[in-house]
Amino acid sequence: MVRSAKPAGGHDPGPTDADEGIWRGRKVARRLVSPDGMVVLVGRNAEDNDILTAKLASPRDFWLHVASGPGSHVVVRNPGGLRRLPRETQRFAAGLAAGYSSAKDGGRTAVHLALAGDVGKPRGFAPGKVQLARFETVMATPQRAPEAGS
């Protein structure tokens, strides 16, 4: 299930531009809220993926991407510095990474999960291409957000 509203009864200290997926006045990511109440940002294209990962993501945020092909970068904001994603948020974010990728029409697929601080972009890499220092692989069923809420 994909939700895009704030969790009921959850404390919201107020969004920052980064929490809204906005860079220099331009929306570069879809903003969703996971079942556990965490902000999830989904890149819209290769150039926006670069901005999302390199400019908006904090090193302690979680980063996800389908393992085998092109797709959106997904960033889960982590202001509390959690060491692991809550299970439902991981399932939600990994599903979005698979759903906004070349694997969107397939079944369960592998998704890389890393801390954003372990994601780098070497000089000369094409837009959207990155290199991972450390990551784990999780399996996910593709899902997409309702377009009206993007």
Question: Over which residues does each language-model region extend?
Answer:
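Duplex nucleic acid-engaging cores and interfaces of nucleic-acid transaction enzymes
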Residues: 2-150
